[in-house]
Each structure stands twice: as C-alpha cells, then as structure tokens.
Amino acid sequence: MITAMGDVMRRAYEKGWITTRDGNISLRRKGSNIFYVTPSGWRKTIIHPEHMIKVRLIPAGLEILDNHAEPSGELSMHSRLQRYHKRTRAVVHLHPTNIIAAMYAGWDLQTLASEFPEVSRYTRVGPSVPVLPVTSDELANATF
C-alpha cells in the first residue's frame, strides 16, 4: 500500500501532472485512524515507503508519529478529507496543467464531467477551488 504511494507520484511526474517537488498524496487503511502522507519538499520521483510520514487522527487534532521529515504542507487538507469523508482512504493532490488551464479559462469541471459520462464513470470530479494561499487552512476548508 505505502509502496504504491511512491509509484503514483512517479507516474504523475511522468505524465506531467506535477513537477519533482509539488503534489502530494495520503493513504489510510480501511477502518484505521492512521494515515500516511508524503513529506514536504522531497523529490516525488525518488520517494519510497520509508520517506512517508505516519499521522494519527485524534479527537483533538493530529499526532505526527514519524518525525524524520516534515509532512506535506497540505497536511491540513489531507487530514480534513481523511477525517470527515469516511469513505475517503486516498487523497491525491496534483497540478495537471490541462486542468489548471481549464479552470483559468472558466470551465466548470463538475458540469463538464456531468455532460460526459466517460469522465464521471472513471473519476470523481470535486468542486473547483478558488486560488487561495498554498498550505492555508482556508484552502483546506475550500476542498469540502
């Protein structure tokens, strides 16, 4: 499971969906209050299981169980999605240039997905999020 996180990030880089240092992923086993998240600032093309940061969801917030590196700056977003969307077990945050271009062109991606069943059949299109400060709680809150 954790090995797949690095595989996903390498594949995302190969497809041009992220640069070597952006994008992040978190993954949680079914029924667990522990999830793993990519570290901040690491090159995503060389990330491996031992680099992942182990985080526990606790009632008062989060408990970082590994301190060998800083967790992703988007930890707030990952933890909210992992905590409040019970069916969510993986959060993949990428920056595909075609999606970013479509958003800046004013396209509503949810409408587009609803008009093309082949899109909604294979992926879940979340709401478009406005441009907000990176790693901010404001950005994390907008992902709901």
Language model features with spans:
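Glycine-rich flexible loops
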Residues: 1-144
